Amino acid sequence: MLAASQITFLQVDLGRWDRSPGGDAIVVPLWTDVRPLRGAAGLLDWRLNGRLSQLLREGRLEGAAGEKLLFFTTRVPWRRVLTIGVGEISTFSEDAFRASMNTVLDSFHGLGIKSVGMALPGRDMERITPERALRVLLSVAEQQAEQNPGNALSELTVIDTPPAIKAMTETVRAIERSLGH
C-alpha cells in the first residue's frame, strides 16, 4: 500500500500546479456528457490551449468508459497526460470508479510511470465522496502492486478541492492509525 509519506494533495489551481514538483504523468477524467470540461480536466485543457476540447470536437476522444489517451506535454510539471474516459454521469458508480482506477494503473505498466498527479474520477461532479474515492484507489493500487510489484507507484498527488483534500488527509491519517503507524 502507498504509505502516507507517498501521498500528497494539490488543489485544482494552475498556480499551485506550476509550483508543484510534477512527475511522470497527470491523470484527468473525461465524461461523455459534460461539456465544457470541468475541474482538473477543464483547467488542464485551458493550459493545453484547448487540446482536449479539440480532440473531443474531432471525435478522436469521447470520454467513454475505459477510453484512454496518453500523450507528452511540456505545458505542466508532469511529463505526460493520461485522460481516462468515465462515461455518463448518470451511470457512474463505485464499481465504475474501481474499473477506471484499474484502467489507469494498468495503463502505466511498462512505461516507467512512478510519480503521478491524479484527479480522481467522479470527484469533479461529486459522484463519489473524497474518503471513499481515496480508500478505493488505495485498495486498487495495493492489488496492482501485489500483481506487478515493479509497476507500483512511488508517489501519488491527488488533485481536488480544499474541502475534499481536508477529508482525504483525515482518511490517510485514519488509515495510518489503523495500521499502527
Predicted features and spans:
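Glycine-/small-residue-enriched capping loops at alpha/beta junctions
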Residues: 1-181
